[in-house]
């Protein structure tokens, strides 16, 4: 596991908090449903997610106008969500999404905006 910056640590911490609050969703189909029904406020896709997963979710984000970032790893996102690996996360609360997005924008190690 790579050494991560303070901004990404905060992102993972907030993702975990959102999960415990019931405001984070994982799984490609569930994420695409949230995007489709306007429940998503922020999508984070792991940098090491498969090309098919990235394309599928980013296409949905572009079509429905959802905010999407490619940042972090599957392992780190998974640990934040209480799993071993997780390719993508959808934040369904505007407050959590805004806070996480602020930290993603400050992250100097990545955080590609789509």
Segments from the language model and where they lie:
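N-terminal first-folded block
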Residues: 9-45
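Structural motif
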Residues: 22, 41-42, 67-69, 86-89
């Amino acid at each position: 596991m790579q050494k991560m910056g303070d901004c990404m640590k905060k992102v993972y911490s907030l993702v975990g908090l959102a999960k415990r609050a019931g405001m984070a969703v994982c799984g490609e189909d569930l994420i695409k449903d949230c995007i489709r029904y306007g429940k998503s406020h922020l999508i984070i896709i792991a940098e090491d997610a498969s090309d098919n997963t990235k394309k599928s979710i980013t296409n949905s984000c572009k079509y429905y106008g959802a905010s999407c970032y490619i940042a972090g790893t599957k392992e780190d996102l998974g640990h934040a969500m209480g799993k071993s690996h997780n390719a993508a996360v959808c934040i369904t609360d505007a407050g959590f999404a805004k806070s996480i997005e602020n930290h993603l924008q400050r992250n100097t190690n990545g955080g590609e905006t789509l």
